[in-house]
UniProtKB/Swiss-Prot annotation:
Full protein name: Toll-like receptor 2 type-1
Annotated source species: Gallus gallus (Chicken)
Quaternary structure, from the entry: Binds MYD88 (via TIR domain).
LRRCT domain segment(s): 542-596
Gene: TLR2-1
Family per similarity comment: Belongs to the Toll-like receptor family.
Domain of life, per lineage: Eukaryota
Alphabetized InterPro entries for the sequence: Cys-rich_flank_reg_C (IPR000483), EF_Hand_1_Ca_BS (IPR018247), Leu-rich_rpt (IPR001611), Leu-rich_rpt_typical-subtyp (IPR003591), LRR_dom_sf (IPR032675), TIR_dom (IPR000157), Toll-like_receptor (IPR017241), Toll_tir_struct_dom_sf (IPR035897)
Compartments where located: Membrane
Record: glycosylation sites: 48, 120, 161, 195, 254, 325, 402, 451
Membrane-crossing residue ranges in chain numbering: 598-618
Length: 793
């Protein structure tokens, strides 16, 4: 019993230890997996752990990490130790998680943090303690949470270096005085306060300067209170998603000077005719206001504004008016803005884009006396109404005009109307459909910049003014560029069909040119250097033929990398196939590909030298003789076989030199042909067939003779025909393998005097007896007896 009772606690402890070990073992691989999956940082120590389904900040953070992206996970809590080791963190992205709680000293080690994004989480309150250690923080995003206020005091009091702040959410309802204490300057402040219901006056006055203030507030009373505070600190005020329904209340009432707001932007706002008039009057009260902008707004009216009230108010200080994508619900009932003429005299910049403008009345256009910049891009302007919009004396000071993306069809007609703008310098009429253009056009005399891109022009003509310094004809159907523009400094030819660079002599002062996305295959050193003033050349995205000449120029031209825009990654070889897709700057062609002519010349030279050496060697070693004899032998072999014995006509064929003919014909012939029985001799003088080729006569005579007599002398070895006879006899020795040759030494001669190529004859002379003509008459009888015996053998 005692032992059993003692074993129970022991077993219990073992089970507990096993469970703890199992839990740790299961948790350890999870942490290792998180380290491997998440903390894979790049060279700048930026770690991306977004969209990984993490429930907590992963362990393993080190002091090397500078950027940590934990966005779009399921993190609910930031604990004290989570970021303790990440002391060099500059950017921390925690947006779109489920964070509802942050320990007070969670950011205690992040003294170097510059950007913190806690947006779109579940924070129900903000604590100044969180941000206390973040004295280097410049950008803070806390919008999209669930807090209803910023607390009783300022949560940002310690953020002395804060530059941009974005706050607010659908539950955000109150801003109290003191909420922004500690912040003196902000580059950008954005408040999402669609449901903001209470604003304590003066709450934003603690911020002395805000470069860009963005607010979204629906309640007009709250909006008015906020605006009155911002008029003294904001430089650029942007109001989003508001529907103005002011009547007698003035936005600037109770405001004291000086007012600082210089730019006012309405984004997504709705206006009526009634409120347009009141806003125009109210804005005149803001004497610092220089720029008014409306983006994606809706006008619920017909343009029936109270011009009398507007005219009675102060003169407007606005110099720039920009309207983009304005929707007029009663567009076809809209008035012609009569009466507004007196309000536009000080405008310097006017932009009405994407708003269906089809005409400006001439009488109104003449009142824009100070206007320098006019932008009507993406509207409904047409040629037959352009004369009304740009009539004589209209827009008298205009220097820049943008009529791009309208419905203009005739360049000649458009140019004629535009010529009324005598001070015009810059003109953009791109994205109209002009097509063919005439040879002559009338332009303003001071025009320097012309944009004709995307206008379906197939060919440029002298319609283009010669005064231009900048010309853009990109995205047309141009095959070439042949205009003479002596003052041109910038030329844009992107997305055309040009195969070569333009002639530099036509545009001698060109500084920058873009000819990307054309059909340019290459350009030479001469073409490139002909542009003396060229500083920038964009020839990227062409199909380059990487020839040896082109590559040699590219690789050796000094400073070309500083001139070519997009070099080297945007310059790709299209051919030859072996280097297609490679960067032009990295391609090296082989010696054979680059110096083919030189290599062929070298090969030809080597072949010539080889043949020359063969000729010299052949001459020295009688190669010509071997070839001629081989040919003759082959010719002889093609004839019928040697005649049988009954066809032998001669006992001997006599081969001798003409200089030895006296001895042969007067002595040897008499001795042999008058012997008993007589010998039949074949002599070339007597027995050769007339008209027959000499070589054939020699071959036939040798083959029809039983023996061949060679009368050797100094004259013999010098005779060409004697050599032929020796040659064929030499072949006969090989063919029949018998001794058919009889050598007679008419005078003493060394065996070495016989050419070395006649190895068989030399062998006969060296190994067998030959007959030598004796000068002694007593021995001559013995000579004849021996010769006759040799012939009979």
């Amino acid at each position: 019993m005692f032992n059993q009772s003692k074993q129970k606690p022991t077993m219990k402890l073992m089970w507990q230890a096993w469970l703890i070990y199992t839990a740790l073992a299961a948790h350890l691989p999870e942490e290792q997996a998180l380290r491997q999956a998440c903390l894979s940082c790049d060279a700048t120590q930026s770690c991306n752990c977004s969209f990984m389904g993490l429930d907590f900040i992963p362990p393993g953070l080190t002091g090397k990490i500078t950027v940590l992206n934990l966005a779009h996970n399921r993190i609910k809590l930031i604990r004290t130790h989570d970021l303790q080791k990440a002391v060099n963190l500059r950017t921390l992205l925690l947006q779109s998680n489920q964070i509802s709680s942050i320990d007070e000293d969670s950011f205690g080690s992040q003294g170097k943090l510059e950007l913190l994004d806690l947006s779109n989480n579940s924070l129900a309150h903000l604590s100044p303690v969180w941000f206390g250690p973040l004295f280097s923080l410049q950008h803070l995003r806390i919008q999209g949470n669930s807090y209803s206020d910023l607390g009783e005091s300022s949560p940002f009091s310690s953020l002395r270096n804060l530059s941009s702040l974005h706050l607010g959410n659908p539950q955000f309802s109150i801003i109290r005085q003191g909420n922004f204490e500690g912040i003196v300057f902000l580059n950008t402040l954005r408040i999402d306060g669609d449901n903001l219901s209470q604003y304590e006056p003066g709450s934003l006055k603690s911020i002395r300067k805000i470069n860009h203030m963005i607010i979204s507030i629906r309640r007009i009373d709250v909006f008015s209170a906020v605006i009155r505070d911002l008029l003294h600190s904001a430089i650029w005020l942007e109001v989003r998603e508001i529907k103005l329904d002011i009547e007698n209340e003035k936005l600037v009432q109770n405001s004291t000077l000086p007012l600082t707001i210089q730019k006012l932007t309405f984004t997504g706002a709705s206006f009526t005719d009634k409120y347009i008039s009141q806003i125009a009057v109210l804005l005149k009260e803001i004497r610092s206001l220089r720029e008014l902008e409306a983006i994606d707004c809706v006008l619920e009216g017909k343009g029936a504004w109270d011009m009398t009230e507007i005219a009675r108010s102060k003169q407007s200080s606005i110099e720039t008016l920009s309207i983009t994508n304005m929707t007029i619900l009663d567009f076809y009932l809209f008035f012609d803005l009569e009466g507004i003429e007196t309000q536009v005299g000080k405008l310097k910049r006017l932009s009405i884009a994407s708003s269906k403008v089809f005409m400006v009345p001439c009488r109104l256009a003449r009142y824009f006396s100070s206007l320098l910049y006019l932008d009507f891009h993406d509207n409904l302007l047409v040629n037959n109404r352009l004369g009304e919009t740009i009539c004589e004396d209209a827009w008298p000071s205009l220097q820049t005009l943008n009529l791009s993306k309208n419905s203009l069809k005739s360049l000649k007609q458009a140019a004629r109307y535009i010529s009324n703008l005598h001070k015009l310098i810059n003109l953009d009429i791109s994205e109209n459909n002009f097509g063919e253009i005439p040879d002559m056009c009338e332009w303003p005399e001071n025009l320097k910049y012309l944009n004709l891109s995307s206008t379906q022009i197939p060919k440029l003509t002298t319609c283009i003014p010669s005064t231009l310094e900048v010309l853009d004809v990109s995205a047309n159907n141009l095959q070439d560029f042949g205009l003479q523009l002596p003052f041109l400094k910038e030329l844009y030819l992107t997305k055309n069909h040009l195969k070569t660079l333009p002639e530099a002599t036509d545009i001698p002062n060109l500084v920058a040119m873009s000819i990307s996305r054309n059909k340019l295959n290459s350009f030479s050193k001469e073409e490139f250097e002909s542009f003396k003033q060229m500083e920038l050349l964009d020839a990227s995205a062409n199909n380059f033929i990487c020839s040896c000449e082109f590559l040699s120029f590219i690789h050796h031209e000094a400073g070309i990398a500083q001139v070519l825009v997009g070099w080297p990654e945007s310059y790709i070889c299209d051919s030859p196939l072996t280097v297609r897709g490679a960067q032009v700057g990295s391609v090296q062609l082989s010696l054979m590909e680059c110096h083919r002519s030189l290599l062929v010349s070298l090969i030809c030279t080597l072949v010539f030298l080889f043949i020359l050496i063969l000729v010299v060697v052949g001459y020295k070693y009688h190669a010509v003789w071997y070839m001629r004899m081989t040919w003759a032998w082959l010719q002889a072999k093609r004839k019928p076989k040697r005649a049988p014995t009954k066809d032998i006509c001669y006992d001997a064929f006599v081969s001798y030199s003409e200089n030895d003919s006296n001895w042969v014909e007067n002595i040897m012939v008499q001795q042999l042909e008058q012997a008993c029985p007589p010998f039949r001799l074949c002599l070339h003088k007597r027995d050769f067939v007339p008209g027959k080729w000499i070589v054939d006569n020699i071959i036939d005579s040798i083959e029809k003779s039983h023996k061949t007599l060679f009368v050797l002398s100094e004259h013999f070895v010098q005779s060409e025909w004697c050599k032929y006879e020796l040659d064929f006899s030499h072949f006969r020795l090989f063919d029949e393998n018998n001794d058919v040759a009889i050598l007679i030494l008419l005078e003493p001669i060394q065996s070495q005097a016989i050419p070395k190529r006649f190895c068989k004859l030399r062998k006969i002379m060296n190994t067998k007896t030959y007959l030598e003509w004796p000068p002694d008459e007593e021995q001559q009888q013995m000579f004849w007896e021996n010769l006759k015996a040799a012939l009979k053998s």
